[in-house]
Amino acid sequence: MNLRVPQLRFEASDELASLCKAGGDPLRLNVLRALANDSFGVLELAQIFATGQSGISHHLKVLAQARLVATRREGNAIFYRRALAQTELFCGKLHAALLDEVDALELPAEVQQRIAVVHSQRAAASHDFFARIADSFQAQQDLIASLPQYRDSLLGLLDSLNFASSATALEVGPGDGGFLPELARRFAQVTALDNSPAMLELARQRCEREGLANVQLELLDALSQSAASADCVVLNMVLHHFAAPAEAIKQLTPRINLGGSLLITELCSHNQSWARDACGDLWLGFEQDDLARWASAAGLMPEESVYLGLRNGFQIQVRHFRRPLAALTVR
């Protein structure tokens, strides 16, 4: 007589074991540290950690099974980022505690250098794109979202902030200068920064046509320490061209005067990969939670947000973050 042995079910302990296993390897812990405020593809992580693609893919699979990383497909590439800990769920507190300890790690110098190389490769690709398409910039921009499609919503949010008549503004990456006239009418002084001479020339021509005497154009990397500060910093459909968006927000925060605002207009996350080649986008939009998390990590407070659906299937997010008068405690 054959007796059937009941199969024991250990779903909860399996989940806990998976999390413990994922955190039990130094390379995986360093991968989590590298993903603290960035997203990388498999090939980029293989380059950063000087590891074969198959090896890094195995480690990422273990991290994904433990729900420590989330994936996002952009065209044929899959990008990895850290998953947020949900402390109300089973294993959530351990997940959060693990990430807190990981954030105390300092990545080896050679890993930091390779991350910088990956960022510079991304930045070079974006810079080369704008050098090539300056003459057709507006047509390229219109493929996704032209300024008239979201201008009223952006201006409505901007006007609701009630800046003083003496307030100043800084626009990063003004493109052909399409938003500069609106800023010039609302601020005493406007500074526009761009690292592309071709694009800055388009902005200069617009300022000349419109007689914008209170706009100053500077050929300068916005993340440069010599960049000006202002009461309102504007990133209008430009963050997706940054090599490291979270780091960009962190470095731009000191450019915002205390009590001032950061206005970000961006695409929500999408999967239309043609935007990379047609529009030079390094990122296919952003998750709403990611922008909020990056801003919070930089010491900014989330304020009003507006979301717009466009007829071509894209969604735009208009986000407002404020720099408090007193410094926040940033973990």
Regions found by a protein language model. Give the residues of each.
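A short acidic, Gly/Pro-enriched loop at the edge of an enzyme's catalytic core
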Residues: L223-V233
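Amphipathic alpha-helical dimerization/coiled-coil segments
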Residues: N2-V5, L89-S136
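N-terminal helix-turn-helix DNA-binding core of bacterial DNA-binding proteins
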Residues: D14-G55, I78-A85
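C-terminal alpha-helical "lid/dimerization" subdomain adjacent to the S-adenosyl-L-methionine
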Residues: S261-H320
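A short glycine-rich, Lys/Arg-flanked "PGG" loop and its adjoining helix->strand segment in the class I
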Residues: E247-S261
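Class I SAM-dependent methyltransferase SAM/SAH-binding core
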Residues: L170, G175-S224
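A short SAM/SAH-binding and catalytic strip from SAM-dependent methyltransferases
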Residues: C232-A244
